[in-house]
Design a protein with these regions (language model features):
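Small-residue hinge/turn detector
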Residues: 5-8
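Surface-exposed ligand/attachment interfaces on beta-rich extracellular proteins
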Residues: 13-15, 35-61, 69-75, 88, ...
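Broad, structure-driven detector of short, well-ordered beta-strand segments within folded domains
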Residues: 21, 76-84, 106-110
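Beta-strand elements of well-folded, non-transmembrane domains
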Residues: 68-70, 84-86, 137-139
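Terminal beta-strand-rich extracellular "head" domains
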Residues: 81-103
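C-terminal interaction-tip segments
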Residues: 124-141
Length: 141
């Protein structure tokens, strides 16, 4: 297909289109086991934003490395891990110590509806946050 990753073979002038490394416009899939994608969202104060919506039939877990900064400079970096199926989801979060102010009122949550898991972030920090995340989705076998 036209969406394969091209790699050098070590032979001059020869390249190989890898069938187990697939790029789409938004994601990179490795060996049919892991999909990696990026997301960038702005969440105004007093609102929530969705970071990820994924099928519990297709995927069983997500690892989300994130960073965010508020418009007043408070920032945090961390990882959210989500274990889910088409009916239930649980999550945990680890993060750095805050910089330039408290970020305790920026809270991640997970829910399942219609077989899909949604990871969202609620912002009550007092200003808009800009969140950037790298999402690794693990396929269900």
């Amino acid at each position: 297909g036209l969406n394969r990753v091209i790699v050098a073979t070590g032979t001059s002038g020869v390249v190989l289109a890898k069938s187990n490394h697939i790029f789409t416009t938004d994601a990179y899939t490795l060996n049919g086991d892991i999909t990696r994608q990026g997301t960038n969202i702005s969440v105004v104060d007093g609102a929530s934003g969705n970071i990820l919506v994924a099928s519990g039939t297709d995927y069983m877990g997500a690892i989300v490395d994130y960073s965010f900064e508020s418009l007043v400079g408070s920032q945090r970096f961390g990882t959210v891990r989500v274990n889910f199926d088409s009916a239930t989801a649980v999550m945990d979060e680890t993060s750095t110590t805050d910089l330039n102010g408290n970020t305790d009122t920026v809270v991640f949550s997970v829910s399942v509806a219609g077989g899909n898991m949604t990871l969202s972030v609620a912002n009550d920090i007092g200003s808009t946050i800009e969140l950037v995340a790298v999402v690794n989705l693990i396929f269900r076998n």
